[in-house]
Amino acid sequence: MNRILVVEDEVDLAVTFDRLLRRQGYRVVTAASRAEGLKAIESAPPALVIADLRLPDGDGHDIIRAAHARNPQVPVIVVTAFASRAARDAALASGASAFLAKPFPASALLRLVHDELERSTH
């Protein structure tokens, strides 16, 4: 099954994403910071990344760039509480394939994960 990297500094959300995705059969790796996310990308490139834009030690845009440096086709879903049009446009310009504003229903995330993985393998 596909390996998904979740880069999220809010512990409760990271745990929720992890459980939700594992229940769907995905292998999940979580990272609570930019540094942990970058290390996870280098050690074993994921099939999909879910990343927050605001991280305690830097910018989620670095996660997008690093993921694409390893695999230009890897889908990156940005999840953020900063839901302005400017934040969305900046994330998409950095290479994010999708953008979700917190809070969002679990079904929206699962649909995006499924759709992005399907798209990246075809």
Where do the protein language model's features map onto the residues?
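Conserved acidic carboxylate
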Residues: 8
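Two-component/phosphorelay signaling modules centered on CheY-like receiver
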Residues: 11-29, 116
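The feature encodes the CheY-like receiver
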Residues: 14, 56, 84
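Acidic catalytic/metal-coordinating carboxylates
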Residues: 33, 59-62
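Short amphipathic alpha-helix used as the core "switch/output" element in two-component signaling
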Residues: 39, 61-73
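Active-site beta3 strand of CheY-like receiver
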Residues: 44-50, 55
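Alpha4 helix (beta4-alpha4-beta5 surface) of REC/receiver domains from two-component response regulators
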Residues: 62, 83-100, 111
